């Protein structure tokens, strides 16, 4: 399998885990869990959406998603949120946490940035970013 497609598949899989975990926790009959589940669903849909098309607002406010290190820390953070639940969602959170740690480590592997999918190459989007 091509490394670029592999990273895209991981990103889509993590986004799918976010959405699935959010829907599982959405019906937990707790206001706080339902609110957190809505945020997890939105972040999951955003992660999936970044693999399809990159809107200029994502480039401006979500620039951390365009590098292995930034996306790795985001996945690790979200994985710990999911890991705080119990049962199957905790297992899914552990998988996301592992993906986040792997992405953080991949940031320091020489030449691996060349295989990053289009959605993780921040230099491809520099012309769309406004100078502040």
Curated annotation (Swiss-Prot):
Protein family (similarity comment):
Belongs to the TVP15 family.
Protein's GO biological process: vesicle-mediated transport
Q: Does the keyword Cytoplasm apply?
A: no
InterPro entries found in the cross-reference section: Golgi_TVP15
GO CC, any one term: COPI-coated vesicle
Q: Where in the cell is it found?
A: Golgi apparatus membrane
Could you tell me what this protein is called?
Golgi apparatus membrane protein tvp15
Role description: Golgi membrane protein involved in vesicular trafficking.
């Amino acid at each position: 399998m091509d490394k670029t497609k592999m990273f895209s598949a991981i990103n889509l899989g993590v986004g799918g885990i976010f959405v699935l975990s959010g829907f599982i926790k959405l019906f937990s009959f707790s206001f706080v869990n339902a609110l957190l589940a809505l945020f997890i669903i939105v972040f999951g849909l955003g992660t999936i959406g970044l693999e399809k098309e990159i809107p200029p607002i994502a480039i401006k406010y979500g620039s951390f998603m365009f590098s292995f290190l930034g996306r790795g820390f985001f996945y690790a953070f979200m994985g710990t949120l999911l890991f705080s639940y119990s049962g199957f969602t905790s297992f899914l959170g552990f998988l996301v946490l592992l993906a986040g740690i792997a992405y953080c480590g991949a940031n320091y592997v020489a030449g691996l940035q060349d295989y990053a999918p289009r959605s993780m190459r921040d230099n491809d989007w520099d012309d769309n970013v406004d100078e502040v």
